[in-house]
Amino acid sequence: MASTIKEALSVVSEDQSLFECAYGSPHLAKTEMTASSSSEYGQTSKMSPRVPQQDWLSQPPARVTIKMECNPNQVNGSRNSPDDCSVAKGGKMVSSSDNVGMNYGSYMEEKHIPPPNMTTNERRVIVPADPTLWSTDHVRQWLEWAVKEYGLPDVDILLFQNIDGKELCKMTKDDFQRLTPSYNADILLSHLHYLRETPLPHLTSDDVDKALQNSPRLMHARNTGGATFIFPNTSVYPEATQRITTRPDLPYEQARRSAWTSHSHPTQSKATQPSSSTVPKTEDQRPQLDPYQILGPTSSRLANPGSGQIQLWQFLLELLSDSSNSNCITWEGTNGEFKMTDPDEVARRWGERKSKPNMNYDKLSRALRYYYDKNIMTKVHGKRYAYKFDFHGIAQALQPHPPESSMYKYPSDLPYMSSYHAHPQKMNFVAPHPPALPVTSSSFFAAPNPYWNSPTGGIYPNTRLPAAHMPSHLGTYY
């Protein structure tokens, strides 16, 4: 038993490659590397007769930190080399690919953790959410931010001065490489693709409105139909959201400057951000729209029946067109909703107009139900005495109906078709004794009647009549 243990220990102690680095001192001859890989690393090695190559590949990889300098060209030269080829050099981890261009994927992995010189937890870009809506100024701001955020060298922003968002989204990788180096083109194109595919996963427009409600530029964007959003850094979304929602008093321009200049001027960003005690809080300054000014002209025009008797819905619009009637009926917003604050008074006035002194709200409400199917108004559920006009349905109801098409009528100028017009109910039947065709000349083969050449003459071609409708003057031979 003891001899077996000694023999096993001797075998293990001979194979030093299991315990020492594969890139150790040159006197180690038994390394578990193939002949091709050893020649690539410039080391003399031989194949181990005891342990096959598959056993070496199945060994769990171990992280080895080499305490010596090595040539980077010899480390990263084979696909069989270890995954971690970093060496300790002067107290700093130096990668073997420092002098080789780094790809975008590895660069973004390193950029996932903010560098030590970052003093803020977010990078905000205040541009429209859809990059295709960017103006040339938005494109310039985005490029300036990307240069500061990713440290992009040799980016000439003037080359992009005539490019807006729509043209920017149409640019390919070759188009970017014509304006900036290949490495910068990869980063810009990837970030643009990210903005287009995943816009604002944690921020909504309501959050931005609460944070920027006092901004004059935001009010202009509301009036012009634009949308303004904030793009924080993807690694710190919750903190960025908290900062934005807890500082609604921060003005738009100061927030923009502090977010875009904090990377290059960390000390100035602290100075530009005012404290909450210095910025006065103001009330929401959104203008309150007057429904009587907006809906007044429309209700006055629709309430005038012109000629004829006024209908109930027109009478209600007549009352709503005058703000002095708000004690009994008033608008609820600008979407056509209204409420009868005193329904009995409204019913009494309607009874006076129609000379019905017994009119009350129950009769009035039953009359209003008739307009539901006509798409003139609807009942607002959950609210008493509240209704809503459908102005689109009213416009459809007021359109004049077109007259009946003439293609279903026979020409009225034909003398032998007078019986059809005398008896409209027999339009589809042949007269029992049609008169003879009029002949206007002495010749029997006169010019054909214009009816047979008219475009409406062939409406019913090849009409087959049942036997019961054959003329009675025909003989039995037929």
From Swiss-Prot:
Keyword Nucleus: yes
Location of this chain's protein in the cell: Nucleus
Biased composition (Polar residues): 34-47, 259-280
Tissue expression summary: Expressed in mesoderm- and, to a lesser extent, in ectoderm-derived tissues.
Domain PNT residue range list: 113-199
Gene3D superfamilies: Transcription Factor, Ets-1, Winged helix-like DNA-binding domain superfamily/Winged helix DNA-binding domain
Family: Belongs to the ETS family.
Chain's role: Acts as a transcriptional activator.
Record protein name field: Transcriptional regulator Erg
Species whose genome carries this gene: Gallus gallus
